Amino acid sequence: MRDKTLFIVVLAVMLLVTACADTAIDRRALVMRNNPHVTKIDSLHSLTVGNGRFAFTADATGLQTFPEYYKEGLSLGTYSEWGWHSFPNKEDYKIVETLQDHPLPGHPHGIYAVQFPEGPERNAKAAEWFRANPHRLHLGNIGFDSLAVSDITEIDQTLDMWKGELHSHFLWRKLPVTVTTSCNGDSDIVSASVSSSAKLAVGIRFPYPTGEAADDATCWTADDCHSTDIILSEPQRALIR
């Protein structure tokens, strides 16, 4: 009787496995039903498009219109694998100045980089410089100009994770605005299509990095530390370096 019961259980498992193997997964439906949907401006509700090497994080407008509002939550940013920056090493710090002997079981002479919270001062500053450098560079902020959070209503935003497109619809001063944001799959390019009867302008800002450990990596008061040049300016395009 026991052998018969065991045979029935094994047979049932085999039939279940066979049935599952014959049932194809609708991958698109699986992904699409988990698309994030945003209906209000919230500093924790930013969404990102990218290609694995380049990423553009947007707010409820589909662009980076309110970076200050989102800075304490999921901050808005544009980052890449290749965009890095280092502050000048004016004091000529050496990596050896950050090392300290920390014996551990099995490793009596373990040498590790530490922060030196109690000094010496030069070692602490060396450790801080190497902690902060190099760091990823925020490549630029792209957003609508002169919009206030209070002017944005009836937000309906969805990230299509299957296509990699961010679809945003909202009212600005009761005028409808539709924005589609996407990133090129092969090149580090972000694009946005804006449809509206409202007279909207788009601005581009380039921040200087901060080097801090936990902020939105943007300093807007260091204009003397970097510059931006307009190489080409035409009615429908511009080349900025």
What positions do the PLM features span?
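Sec-dependent N-terminal signal peptides
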Residues: 6-12
